[in-house]
Regions:
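Alpha-helical transmembrane segments and membrane-interface helix-loop junctions
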Residues: 1-168
Length: 168
């Protein structure tokens, strides 16, 4: 099981590091969009939509990377005072909750994504980016990766429980 958790962690780390480069691309596109709009009075719907096409993978894959590295949102004000045992309990409970939430989002988003792919959904804006269905397809994909990372966190926390019990 620990090998599975390690493999999941390595994959999520790889995806997260690759996705991080999209942040640079997003900043450049946004900067160019602002420069063109306010410096030259030239608006570009394509560039505005491209920002969303970059932001979606940053968010859906970034949340997995943040969970892996413990940078996700947590109420550290209280958590920092918990014993190690209670921290592990909270980590197991939240990881299981994360898996349940991921499964729900995947189940609810699949018909939405399927419909988008089946009609080859594009933009309604003239001059915008077609292939909106690709971005929508990242929703269940990102939550599947989040499910796997939550599973990895559950495995690691359960092994930490067992190791702590063996020491005591």
């Amino acid at each position: 099981m620990q090998r599975l958790a390690g493999a999941i962690d390595a994959f999520v780390d790889l995806v997260g590091r690759a996705t991080a480069w999209l942040t640079l691309g997003l900043a450049l596109v946004m900067g160019a969009n602002v420069l063109l709009r306010y410096g030259f009075s030239v608006g570009s719907i394509w560039m505005q939509e491209f920002e969303w096409h970059l932001l979606v993978p940053i968010c859906v894959f970034g949340m997995c990377y943040a969970l892996l590295h413990g940078e996700h949102v947590r109420v550290d004000v209280a958590f920092q005072y918990f014993s190690e045992r209670n921290k592990r309990r909270v980590n197991v409970a939240t990881a299981i909750l994360g898996m349940a939430l991921s499964a729900i989002v995947i189940k609810l988003s699949l018909p939405y994504v399927y419909q988008s792919w089946s009609i080859n959904e594009g933009t309604a804006n003239p001059g915008g980016i077609e292939h909106r269905y690709i971005v929508k397809g990242l929703i269940p994909l990102g939550f599947a990766l989040y499910f796997l990372q939550s599973l990895s966190e559950t495995i690691k926390s359960c092994f930490a429980f067992r190791s702590a019990r063996d020491v005591a």
